[in-house]
C-alpha cells in the first residue's frame, strides 16, 4: 500500500497529492481565534466533509466547484483505513486565490463591534439604528487576507482585493476580484434561502476560490460548514442580542469566559459541540450521518 504524506497541513485540514487530483482530509481538530485547540472533536471531520458535499452539489449550477468525490471506494487504498472514513474529499487541483471571501447577512461578531464604534462593518457604511443580530438590508461582502498558520486574517476593502490579485495576475485583478465578490453573494443568497426553509439562519460565512488550468474561477476548500459559518436556529430568533448557534461560536464563547483554559476544552463542551454540528447537518440535509 502506498503511503501518503501531507503536502500541506492547515489548522483543521490536511492536503495530499494524488497525481492529477488532491485528497483533502478534514480532521477532528478544532481551531478558535487562529489557534488549534488541544482537544479533538470526535466525528467533526465527517460532518465538515459531508456538509460541504451537500452544498457543493446544491450550488453546482451557480458556481463550478472542485469536488470530485467523497466516496470511500474512490479513494486510494491508503485513505480507506478506518481513521479516514467519511473525512476525505477528492478534489481538482486549483491555484488558490489569497482572499477569504466573507459575506455577512446579519450584523454580529466583529461586524457588530465595529458598527457600535463607527457605524460600519469592515469599512462598509451601514444604516443607522441596527440592533445586534439584525438582518442587513442586503448581504455585504467583506473580504480578508488569508493568514499563515498562527497569524490573524486581516480585513481588506474590495478595492484592496483588486490590488492584491492584480499583483499576482497582471491585467486580471479587477476581473477576478469582481468574480469573487459576485460569486460569494450569489452563493450566500441561494443557500441562505434554502437554510431558512430548514429552520436555520446563515448569519455569515466564508468561501475560498481558486483558478483551474484555463483560468476559470472555481469554488474550493470547504463550503457552509459550522467551522466556516455562523448558523443560528430560526426558532426563537429575535434581533437585539446574541443568538444561540450550531457552530464554533459555542467554543469561542466558552474560551472567552475561561481565559485561563490554555485552549483545553472540558469533555462536556466537546460533547455539546459535536452534538450541535451533527444537529445542523441533520436539519440542513434531512439525513443522519
Model features per residue range: what roles?
Residues 171-203:
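A long amphipathic alpha-helix within ATP-dependent nucleotide-binding catalytic cores
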Residues 21, 96-98, 198-202, 214-217:
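Coil-to-beta-strand transition motifs
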